[in-house]
Protein backbone atom coordinates (compact mmCIF):
# COMPACT_ATOMS: atom_id res chain seq x y z
CA UNK A 1 0.00 0.00 0.00
CA UNK A 2 2.90 2.35 0.75
CA UNK A 3 4.30 1.84 -2.77
CA UNK A 4 0.87 2.76 -4.22
CA UNK A 5 0.91 6.04 -2.24
CA UNK A 6 4.42 6.85 -3.48
CA UNK A 7 3.35 6.28 -7.09
CA UNK A 8 0.24 8.43 -6.56
CA UNK A 9 2.34 11.30 -5.18
CA UNK A 10 4.81 11.01 -8.07
CA UNK A 11 1.96 11.03 -10.60
CA UNK A 12 0.41 14.11 -8.99
CA UNK A 13 3.75 15.94 -9.06
CA UNK A 14 4.16 15.15 -12.75
CA UNK A 15 0.64 16.36 -13.50
CA UNK A 16 1.16 19.57 -11.54
CA UNK A 17 4.34 20.22 -13.48
CA UNK A 18 2.45 19.64 -16.72
CA UNK A 19 4.53 16.62 -17.51
CA UNK A 20 7.37 18.93 -18.48
CA UNK A 21 9.87 17.18 -16.22
CA UNK A 22 9.50 13.89 -18.06
CA UNK A 23 8.84 15.27 -21.54
CA UNK A 24 10.76 18.54 -21.52
CA UNK A 25 13.24 17.54 -24.19
CA UNK A 26 10.71 15.68 -26.32
CA UNK A 27 7.92 18.24 -26.36
CA UNK A 28 8.94 21.90 -26.39
CA UNK A 29 6.68 24.02 -24.23
CA UNK A 30 4.47 26.72 -25.74
CA UNK A 31 6.61 29.57 -27.05
CA UNK A 32 7.12 31.90 -30.03
CA UNK A 33 8.85 30.11 -32.88
CA UNK A 34 9.67 30.89 -36.50
CA UNK A 35 7.56 29.24 -39.18
CA UNK A 36 7.28 29.51 -42.95
CA UNK A 37 3.72 30.17 -44.10
CA UNK A 38 2.04 30.75 -47.46
CA UNK A 39 -0.21 33.57 -48.66
CA UNK A 40 -2.24 33.36 -51.82
CA UNK A 41 -5.50 34.62 -53.30
CA UNK A 42 -7.70 33.00 -55.94
CA UNK A 43 -7.55 36.22 -57.97
CA UNK A 44 -3.75 36.65 -57.86
CA UNK A 45 -1.33 34.56 -59.95
CA UNK A 46 1.43 34.11 -57.37
CA UNK A 47 1.71 32.52 -53.92
CA UNK A 48 4.16 34.12 -51.50
CA UNK A 49 5.95 32.13 -48.79
CA UNK A 50 7.27 34.09 -45.83
CA UNK A 51 8.74 33.43 -42.41
CA UNK A 52 7.03 34.87 -39.36
CA UNK A 53 6.72 34.15 -35.64
CA UNK A 54 3.87 31.90 -34.50
CA UNK A 55 2.96 30.25 -31.21
CA UNK A 56 3.72 26.54 -31.09
CA UNK A 57 4.53 23.90 -28.53
CA UNK A 58 3.16 21.65 -25.85
CA UNK A 59 0.46 22.66 -23.36
CA UNK A 60 -0.34 20.37 -20.43
CA UNK A 61 -3.78 18.79 -20.60
CA UNK A 62 -5.77 16.21 -18.71
CA UNK A 63 -8.46 13.76 -19.75
CA UNK A 64 -10.81 12.20 -17.23
CA UNK A 65 -10.20 8.48 -16.95
CA UNK A 66 -13.43 7.68 -15.12
CA UNK A 67 -16.82 8.82 -16.44
CA UNK A 68 -18.10 11.78 -14.50
CA UNK A 69 -21.29 13.80 -14.32
CA UNK A 70 -19.25 16.91 -15.03
CA UNK A 71 -18.68 18.12 -18.58
CA UNK A 72 -15.20 17.57 -20.03
CA UNK A 73 -12.62 20.14 -19.01
CA UNK A 74 -11.27 22.60 -21.55
CA UNK A 75 -8.25 21.49 -23.56
CA UNK A 76 -5.58 24.16 -23.65
CA UNK A 77 -3.77 25.13 -26.83
CA UNK A 78 -0.64 27.17 -27.43
CA UNK A 79 -1.98 30.57 -28.43
CA UNK A 80 -0.99 34.21 -28.65
CA UNK A 81 -0.68 36.18 -25.41
CA UNK A 82 0.56 39.33 -27.15
CA UNK A 83 0.60 39.86 -30.89
CA UNK A 84 0.97 42.44 -33.58
CA UNK A 85 -0.16 42.32 -37.18
CA UNK A 86 1.97 42.59 -40.27
CA UNK A 87 1.07 42.68 -43.95
CA UNK A 88 2.57 41.69 -47.27
CA UNK A 89 1.56 42.62 -50.80
CA UNK A 90 0.79 39.78 -53.19
CA UNK A 91 2.40 40.62 -56.54
CA UNK A 92 0.60 40.52 -59.87
CA UNK A 93 -2.96 40.96 -58.62
CA UNK A 94 -5.33 42.44 -61.21
CA UNK A 95 -6.86 45.91 -60.69
CA UNK A 96 -9.76 45.86 -58.27
CA UNK A 97 -8.34 42.98 -56.20
CA UNK A 98 -6.95 43.82 -52.77
CA UNK A 99 -3.34 42.53 -52.86
CA UNK A 100 -2.74 42.97 -49.10
CA UNK A 101 -2.46 39.83 -46.95
CA UNK A 102 -2.41 40.48 -43.17
CA UNK A 103 -1.26 37.98 -40.55
CA UNK A 104 -0.60 37.86 -36.79
CA UNK A 105 2.97 37.94 -35.45
CA UNK A 106 3.56 36.36 -32.04
CA UNK A 107 5.22 38.58 -29.44
CA UNK A 108 4.53 36.18 -26.56
CA UNK A 109 2.57 32.95 -26.13
CA UNK A 110 0.62 31.13 -23.44
CA UNK A 111 -1.51 28.06 -22.98
CA UNK A 112 -5.20 28.93 -23.04
CA UNK A 113 -8.48 28.48 -24.84
CA UNK A 114 -8.31 28.83 -28.58
CA UNK A 115 -9.45 32.20 -29.92
CA UNK A 116 -10.59 31.76 -33.50
CA UNK A 117 -10.27 35.52 -34.10
CA UNK A 118 -6.52 35.11 -34.64
CA UNK A 119 -5.65 31.43 -34.29
CA UNK A 120 -6.03 28.28 -36.33
CA UNK A 121 -7.06 25.72 -33.74
CA UNK A 122 -7.19 22.75 -36.06
CA UNK A 123 -3.82 21.38 -35.04
CA UNK A 124 -0.56 21.15 -36.94
CA UNK A 125 -0.56 20.89 -40.71
CA UNK A 126 1.72 18.54 -42.57
CA UNK A 127 2.84 21.35 -44.90
CA UNK A 128 1.46 24.77 -43.83
CA UNK A 129 3.57 26.56 -46.45
CA UNK A 130 2.21 24.59 -49.40
CA UNK A 131 1.31 26.76 -52.38
CA UNK A 132 -1.09 25.73 -55.12
CA UNK A 133 0.23 28.45 -57.47
CA UNK A 134 3.77 29.40 -58.56
CA UNK A 135 5.48 30.93 -55.56
CA UNK A 136 7.97 33.57 -54.50
CA UNK A 137 9.86 33.62 -51.21
CA UNK A 138 9.68 36.85 -49.24
CA UNK A 139 12.14 37.67 -46.46
CA UNK A 140 10.56 39.92 -43.82
CA UNK A 141 12.74 42.09 -41.63
Curated annotation (Swiss-Prot):
The keyword Glycoprotein applies. Promotes spermatogenesis and ovulation by stimulating the testes and ovaries to synthesize steroids. Heterodimer of a common alpha chain and a unique beta chain which confers biological specificity to thyrotropin, lutropin, follitropin and gonadotropin. SMART domains: GHB. This is Lutropin subunit beta. Residues 1-22 form the signal peptide. Disulfide bonds join 30-78, 44-93, 47-131, 55-109, 59-111, 114-121. It comes from the Eukaryota. The keyword Signal applies. Gene3D superfamilies: Cystine-knot cytokines. GO terms for cellular component: cytoplasm; extracellular space. Belongs to the glycoprotein hormones subunit beta family. It comes from Trichosurus vulpecula. It is found in: Secreted. PANTHER family: GLYCOPROTEIN HORMONE BETA CHAIN, LUTROPIN SUBUNIT BETA.
Amino acid sequence: MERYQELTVLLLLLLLEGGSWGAGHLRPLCRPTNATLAAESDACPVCVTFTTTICAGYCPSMVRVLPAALPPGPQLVCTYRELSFSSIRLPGCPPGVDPIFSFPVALSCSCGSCRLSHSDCGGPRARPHLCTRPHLSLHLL
